[in-house]
Amino acid sequence: MSFRFINPEALGAPRGYSNGVLTSGGRLLFIAGQVAWNREQEIVSDDLVAQFDRALENLIAVVTEAGGQPEQIARLILYVTDKDEYKQRMTEIGERYRARMGKHFPAMVLVEVAGLLEDRAKVEIEAVAVL
């Protein structure tokens, strides 16, 4: 399995994501939206950065359980309840991201939503990995 990151010059240099990811070989793993909850399915914090970190940790746990590594994540979809807060805290969020994902930047989208199924959740992350 290999990834080729597609970033056309005409689109400018992306910051923290890739415009496209071309894969060859491997199996697809579709990862359900992950929120910042623990084993008892309780949200661990009301802080956005802490929630982002735990949701990403939970997502990576699914990839690992399937026999993969974070570098095999091809696409991330982030749902947030407050885009402005996310933008204000991007530096902190980026630090947590790099601590878990290194400099691996899959195709990514961020969507602001009115709410998530878990009332206290501020972020939910789903993904596709190629194993």
Placement of each model-derived feature along the sequence:
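N-terminal presequence-like segments and the immediate start of the first folded domain
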Residues: 1-57, 61-74, 80-131
